[in-house]
Amino acid sequence: GGCRRYHPGPHQYTDDQMRRRIQKLKWKLKRMGGVDIVVTHAPPYGLGDGDDPAHWGFESLVELLDTYHPQYLVHGHVHIRYGARERVRDYNGTTLINATERYTFEIPDRPVDGKQLGQVIYKTRQKREDPLERHC
């Protein structure tokens, strides 16, 4: 998650930092046979991003699309009301969805050769145990 660094603050990354974050997933992606759905905060560069630094997308996400060819990439950050942008577009067989504000879509349940269905390979947040709850 996160967006392009445009001023000091949390959850902002340079493109090199985002590329390293994606690289950390390389072996998991290989072991799992790829990825079907990618969910990000910011869009890929040139594919639904904005003209100002605060809304630029990541080139490293374009590289991810070109390498792994997921079925979907769902992003936010660039609101539709900021200008005439497509909510849904295609990039080399990947459906890109700008899900800002809200967007409902259905994903067909179908097997894909070489991929294991129903497995999560990366979780960013886990519930932390409250030490006070253990002693109640």
Identify the residue ranges that each predicted region occupies:
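Catalytic metal-binding/acid-base residues of hydrolase active sites
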Residues: 4-5, 43-45, 77-81, 102
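Conserved catalytic scaffold of divalent metal-dependent phosphoesterases
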Residues: 1-56, 60, 125
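Short glycine-rich loop/turn motifs that provide flexible caps or phosphate-binding loops at active sites
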Residues: 1, 75, 92
